[in-house]
Amino acid sequence: ALKIIDEQPIGPQGSEVGFATLNGAFHRLTGVNMTWYDITGALGMAAIAVACGFGLFGLWQLIKRGSLSRVDRDIYALAGLYRAIGIVYVLFEKAVVNYRPIDMGAGLEPSFPSSHTMLTCCIMSSAIWQFKRRIKSEALRKTTVLLCTAVMAVTIAGRLVSGVHWMTDIAGGVLLSASLMEFYRAAAIR
């Protein structure tokens, strides 16, 4: 639908954008705010640090338990989720749906889905799932869940107002992350 409905050449270099009336109006409303771009960039790095932390946790389980078969199934599922994020990213870098609404110095760059939004939402929502299962202290559990939720919310809102993606690209990142999370949960609890 993104490449069929209301497609118009409103992007840089006359690039075609789906849902052009909606995307164009929202982009004109918000403009470009590189401060929010930088803030969400830092939050994305924080999300990657969380993913690395779970990778180290899996390595710790392997060393402590002495066997690949003794590493928790949900940690393997988490590794699968992270690989799936990478595959989706590469897929949409090759099968371009929309280009960014602004030229960031590298010419036309793919914008759908907002990979930053997808990555942050996937990592943080899977972290929430892990923390709810693993943290015994209710206060610490609630704090980590709140922090993860805040990182996701600020990333989504920040990417919306940064102006480096079309609105539908950010929505696509959120929807793809929700889909990937459902596959992760199904694999983790089997």
Would you name each region that the model predicts?
Residues 1-111, 118-146:
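Hydrophobic alpha-helical bundle signature of multipass membrane enzymes
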